[in-house]
Design a protein with these regions (language model features):
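Extended, solvent-exposed, turn-rich assembly/linker loops in the middle of proteins
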Residues: 141-224
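N-terminal "assembly arms/tails" that initiate or stabilize quaternary assembly
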Residues: 1-88, 185, 314-335
């Protein structure tokens, strides 16, 4: 039996659909409800341009209402319903893999499914990292510009032994949620480094629930779905590591995937391998990942798309919603 070649199984339309389905299924922030697709962003991502605006209505306020009376000369003055915008930035991304990279998958019983699964996993991880670095950017902006009113930081870089007061705990997580005041009931998921997750497990604060729809087992902390990701910030100081845990509400991050001219293609180089030939699979995406309540200012972006480092830069973010209306908070601990 001859070996399957990537050209034998590659169909651009089928591949694009299967790869997108795989990345959605494998993205922990999508499956937890933290990130949701916004049809407006998907449409905007397909029309071209790197920067766009997402309009929103400002809250009506909480001022005391008028009191009705029977005086014909008394009239009420209507308040204005005002709008504002959140600016976002599109990320045009691509990557490629050679036949040698995919050789193991080509030998499997379902090579097409194996390859699209691997590429889908790659893009799921890439989008998760864009989400995480965006939240690190709004954390940095919050500390720099808004007095850190979204973060509780109990970590230190002291040379002494770490105390319980500097470690994650039930009280510390509740304190972080309290930064949202009476809006804290909107929190639905908590993302943490595996070191923090392990400590909560040792305290027997993590439960496991099986999804009735797809029989998937997932972790919960109280009423919060748990996402464990070691790409969350773990900054080593002179003496200690500071871990950042992020608590989200449902749909606190919106996303959109635009249509690229050629989402994927296969290129054949017959001269490679001293004439043996090599096939290269290219995958391209146009994505928007945007935390609600903030605008991306692009004040410190060098290229057409923001890199992960630029997403985490405080100067590139500005809060445009009131703190209580943003279902995101942060907890920084030494473990």
């Amino acid at each position: 039996m001859s070996q399957v070649q990537i050209a034998d199984i590659y169909n651009p339309l089928v591949f694009a659909g299967a790869e997108q389905e795989a990345q959605i299924e494998l993205n922990a922030f999508l499956s937890s409800g933290v990130m949701v697709e916004d049809p407006r962003l998907t449409a905007m991502a397909s029309v071209g341009g790197n920067i766009g605006e997402l309009p929103f209505f400002k809250p009506l306020g909480t001022e005391e209402p008028n009191y009705s009376n029977d005086v014909t000369g008394d009239t009420s003055t209507p308040n204005k319903i005002t709008t504002a915008i959140m600016r976002y930035r599109l990320a045009s991304q691509n990557n490629s893999w050679s036949t040698m990279d995919l050789a193991a998958d080509l030998a499997l019983q379902d090579p097409a499914g194996a390859i699209t699964g691997r590429v889908g996993q790659y893009w799921a991880t890439a989008l998760e990292r864009r989400l995480i670095q965006s939240t690190m950017g709004i954390l940095a902006s919050n500390v720099a510009n808004d007095g850190g009113d979204m973060v509780v930081n109990i970590a230190t870089d002291a040379s002494s032994t770490i105390t319980d007061a500097e470690l994650v705990s039930n009280d510390a997580i509740l304190d972080a949620q309290q930064t949202a005041g009476d809006h804290q009931s909107g929190f639905s998921a908590i993302a943490m480094h595996s070191v923090v997750y392990s400590r909560l497990r040792k305290q027997q604060l993590i439960d496991f629930v099986r999804d009735a729809d797809n029989n998937t087992l997932f972790s919960t902390y109280g009423n919060l779905r748990v996402v464990v990701d070691d790409s969350l910030s773990a900054v080593a100081g002179s003496n200690r590591v500071t871990y950042t845990t992020v608590i989200f509400g449902n749909g606190s991050v919106v996303s959109g995937m635009g249509r690229t001219t050629t989402p994927s293609e296969l290129d054949r180089d017959p001269e490679k391998g001293n004439g043996g030939g090599q096939s290269t699979l290219y995958s391209r995406r146009a994505d928007i990942v945007h935390p609600l309540g903030f605008q991306f200012t692009s004040d410190s972006v060098a290229g057409q798309s923001a890199t992960l480092a630029e997403l985490s830069t405080a100067a590139n973010w500005e809060r445009v919603w009131e703190r209580k209306n943003i279902p995101i908070c942060f907890l920084q601990t030494n473990g």
